[in-house]
Amino acid sequence: MYGSSNYKQEISLGIDCGSKMIRLSATTKAQELYSAEVELRNDIVNLLSTRKQYRKTRRSRLRYRKARFQNRVKSKNKGWLAPSIENKINTHIKIIVDLHKILPITNIIVETASFDIQKINNPDIEGKEYQEGNQLGFWNVREYVLFRDGHKCCVKGCKEKVLNVHHIESRKTGGNTPNNLITICEKHHKQYHEGKLKLNLKRGESFRDATFMGIMRWTFYNRLKQIYPNVKNTYGYITKNTRIVNELPKEHRVDARCISGNPSAKPLGYWYYIKQVRRHNRQIHKAKILKGGKKKLNQAPYLVKGFRLFDKVEYNGQIGFIFGRRTKGDFDIRTLDRKSISKSANYKKLKLINTRKSLLIERR
């Protein structure tokens, strides 16, 4: 009535960045206005590795193909990042852009982290020891792994002398790092791959998430700064101190509220769980060729009885998402944490709430 139409409260957005999850909290000094957790896609590495495997096999069947060298994208494009990392950075930015459409955010505070992986492995490391890794003095990884395991098979009581180095997690996604390799004799190695022997093996600690945070940290911050100039950076120790001073519990969404700079703001009382899914399965046929040289389709119909995969629906008063479809019209309905609502819900009993998006949203 008295010139208040142009007045806007200052809203701060706190973002706790992550490799698997993003936590967000938008607050004023008095009230929390938005709280969410976003689950990022972690299937991209496996999908790209599988695609690479099929591509190499396909090319190997073409004998006259010219050798391909010096064709690496990384060497051509400065600032190139792996698709899995690029996707996660873009999702961080997309979430923030979408939130600006519903709230007049004035400040953005981002918490990122850098990890000293060498220090995690060895807290006492210093100086030139950073350049003297575990494999110093060994010809290759295989020689180091054999030495580390005492040139003995991992199967208890085995005294076979012909030894192999086995990947605990598939090399396709696990790589050739020593903590993913173990010594096993040729006899037991063959039995294991034939399914005749079971081994309870767990790979050593993986630093994928720590590596990702180190790569994405400044790239994300600088890209976001180009879109919104009012971006500030903060650190984990500051968030921890804020949480302790205000006697708040250790929860990720609480951390996001502390990052926003308003730890004493009244909690919203509910929050949103957001899950990112891929939009399309671009593999046309299954890799396995059936009898008669036939190829089986790897893609389901776009619509089944008017519904798509991951459509948000209501069934018997419960809200869920379509996780599976059958052509006769019976669907698998679940919540985003995969809790089953119905394994065979008839399409006639479903009420469409929202068509599928790349970001599925569930209020909790």
Where do the PLM segments sit?
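Intrinsically disordered, low-complexity, charged/polar segments
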Residues: 339-364
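Two-metal-ion RNase H-like nuclease active-site motif
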Residues: 10-18
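Short cysteine-rich loop/turn motifs with clustered Cys
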Residues: 101-107, 136-164, 185-188, 308, ...
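A short acidic-Thr-Gly-centered motif at the start of a beta-strand
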Residues: 1-11
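SH3/SH3-like beta-barrel fold
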Residues: 24-26, 331-337
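Histidine-centered nuclease catalytic patch
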Residues: 154-183, 194-197
